[in-house]
């Protein structure tokens, strides 16, 4: 039986729309000395492959792979060690390598730099050519049958070759079905995650001896280890192993064997208080580095210093992680950032606050001016005496337990209670809206711990992963969100913790304003901002989106339906396919939008969304399918201007006078 064309296309959805910024646009740069800032590739995720002395420095250089974006292996030259002990590296160079992720890089005693890679059911050995900056294949062999579909490998060297540890799945299967359907239910009626809990374990392939399971159980690390490193922690611990994990634990195995493996029971790497450390973000991989280890997953790279001490549990004790640094770095806002511009420290110039998928709120201090801004690398905003970090936890993500470590925090700031200082209101992965009241001063914010906002005594709740728009209108504070019906909805402040219903916002033709291109995982992901873009005195919406957003309706909305194309066929045939293909199967990427207010601030009504185009009439799409924020701002002079982000944490300030918003 012939399959419908759209079903055939589903099987070949392999390409996506390409990002576009105006020619010459550069990411905002770090204004710290030597441009130092957190080391992060232009990727969602990182895999630290290992280190080697390539350039002859005092400390080793670093090999890092990126994915979730352009996939490549990068080499970072060591240049310094910062005061807090974190290594500092130069800008990366791309290494020619046929393999991008499932590998481990190490240096033999004679100086040769070796890369071992998993290529489906084969193990590939490569050697690094320093002159050509290339990993050249030298050997390829079948993996033993017991090593079935390994996800990562770790290497312990010995005089006879390599002792290899492979990460394998226990075969557990998660919830059935698609998160993009009404039928999706990741939790049962008792609130418990459905499906089997997926765990990983280790199998060893020693230089001498049999291939065998080397961990005590097949239920070692939930969901993913994401990487394995051999590490020398001193006498009696020269050949231990540490793995990463989906949830951010670093998992330690003492190896008693002088060759091969004799692993003890797993232990969670401890902090100096004796409690298990938890990486700041999801999915850290790990690699030993002199003095400790480097870990990275989603987000930037971190260095953990080994203290030389051991916890009562038998785990090694490491210091709290500090950022690995790069010179001449872009400002880094974390993955899927959602920014706002306010004078956070009361010095008369606009700073940047940004939330991200890790769940932090970051403060980028402007040490320049509004016309010529210069920003220092971020510090994390605190509330109630602790860093703000909002994450889904066990049941806070509609896509399931495996998303417990994501937050997708989207902050906005306004003087909510008219006491002269800025407060924070946030949306996040849960769809809830929280307020952080500022009890400090204009120059030194001091936020209370988060409290819910209520409407009619019910927690204010809407679509997940959205940002609230805030404005002062006629002496009252207005708040707009994407509500539970998937519509733009206005609320008015009653008091510090309560709002009243202001009604659904509408288009100028009277229709409601829808948001999502689908249900479940295809819903929400909309970052609203009140801003007078056309300077007519009426507040418009500037909107950050993901690719599955469809404003104002699923049939014609932006960007998904209006800009989406089939990812397979171009030209005339492609245009015909586009007309026949359901919108949810078309591909585009997150696109900043503006919706002009054709009414007044007191009686808002909005025109259909418009895209921003550059002087060559090309649509501005900073990069990424998930979602990022976009706000109007007076930063940069001759405003209004547009501050946008790609999902890899870079921010871009675009001059408004070089942007077009005509239909």
What are the functions of these language-model segments?
Residues 3-13:
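Sec-dependent N-terminal signal peptides
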Residues 16-663:
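Beta-propeller-forming repeat regions
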């Amino acid at each position: 039986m012939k399959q419908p064309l759209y079903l055939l296309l589903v099987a070949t959805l392999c390409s996506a729309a390409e990002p576009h910024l105006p020619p010459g646009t550069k990411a905002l740069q770090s204004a710290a000395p030597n441009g130092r800032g957190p080391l992060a590739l232009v990727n969602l995720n990182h895999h630290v492959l290992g280190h080697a002395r390539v350039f002859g420095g005092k400390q080793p250089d670093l090999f890092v792979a990126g994915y979730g974006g352009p996939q490549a292996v990068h080499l970072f030259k060591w240049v310094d060690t910062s005061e807090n002990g974190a290594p500092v590296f130069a800008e990366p160079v791309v290494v020619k390598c046929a393999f991008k992720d499932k590998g481990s890089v190490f240096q033999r005693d004679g100086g040769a730099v070796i890369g071992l890679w998993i290529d489906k059911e084969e193990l590939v050995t490569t050697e690094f050519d320093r002159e050509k900056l290339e990993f050249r294949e030298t050997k390829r062999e079948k993996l033993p049958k017991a090593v079935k579909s390994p996800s990562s490998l770790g290497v312990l060297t010995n005089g006879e070759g390599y002792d290899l540890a492979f990460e394998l799945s226990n075969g557990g299967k998660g919830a059935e079905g698609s998160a993009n359907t009404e039928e999706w239910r990741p939790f049962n009626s008792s609130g418990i995650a459905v499906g089997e809990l997926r765990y990983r374990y280790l199998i060893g392939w020693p230089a001498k001896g049999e291939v065998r399971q080397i961990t005590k159980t097949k239920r070692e690390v939930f969901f993913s280890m994401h990487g394995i490193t051999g590490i020398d922690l001193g006498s009696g611990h020269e050949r231990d192993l540490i793995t990463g994990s989906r949830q951010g634990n670093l998992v330690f195995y003492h190896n008693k064997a002088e060759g091969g493996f004799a692993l003890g029971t797993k232990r969670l790497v401890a902090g100096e208080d004796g409690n298990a450390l938890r990486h700041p973000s999801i999915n850290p991989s790990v690699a030993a580095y002199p003095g400790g280890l480097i870990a990275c997953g989603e987000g930037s790279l971190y260095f953990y210093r080994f203290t030389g001490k051991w916890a009562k549990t038998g785990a090694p004790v490491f210091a709290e992680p500090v950022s690995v640094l790069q010179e001449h770095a872009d400002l880094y806002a974390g993955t899927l950032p959602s920014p706002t511009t306010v004078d956070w420290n009361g010095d008369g110039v606009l700073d940047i606050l940004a939330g991200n998928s890790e769940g932090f709120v970051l403060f980028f201090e402007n040490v320049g001016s509004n016309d010529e801004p210069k920003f220092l690398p971020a510090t994390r905003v605190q509330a109630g005496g602790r860093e703000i970090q909002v994450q889904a936890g066990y049941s806070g993500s509609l896509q399931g337990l495996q998303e417990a470590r994501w937050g997708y925090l989207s902050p906005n700031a306004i003087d909510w209670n008219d006491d002269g200082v800025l407060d924070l209101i946030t949306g996040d992965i849960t769809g809830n809206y929280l307020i952080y009241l500022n009890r400090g001063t204009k120059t030194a914010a001091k936020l209370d711990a988060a409290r819910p906002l209520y409407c009619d005594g019910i927690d204010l709740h809407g679509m997940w992963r959205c940002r609230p728009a805030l404005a002062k209108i006629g002496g009252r504070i207005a708040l707009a969100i994407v509500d539970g019906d998937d519509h733009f909805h206005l609320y008015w402040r009653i008091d510090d913790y309560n709002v009243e219903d202001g009604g659904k916002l509408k288009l100028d033709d009277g229709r409601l304003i829808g948001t999502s291109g689908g249900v479940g995982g295809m819903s929400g992901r909309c970052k609203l901002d009140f801003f007078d873009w056309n300077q007519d005195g009426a507040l418009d919406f500037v909107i950050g989106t993901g690719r599955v957003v469809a404003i104002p309706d699923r049939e014609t909305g932006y960007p998904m339906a209006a800009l989406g194309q089939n990812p397979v066929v171009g030209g005339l045939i492609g245009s015909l396919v586009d007309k026949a293909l359901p919108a949810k199967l078309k591909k585009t990427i997150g696109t900043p939008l503006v919706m002009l207010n054709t009414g007044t601030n007191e009686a808002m009504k909005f025109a259909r969304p418009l895209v921003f185009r550059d002087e060559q009439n090309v649509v501005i799409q900073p990069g990424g399918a998930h979602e990022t924020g976009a706000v109007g701002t007076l930063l940069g002079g001759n405003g209004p201007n547009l501050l946008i982000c790609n999902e890899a944490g870079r921010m871009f300030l675009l001059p408004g006078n070089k942007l077009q918003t005509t239909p």
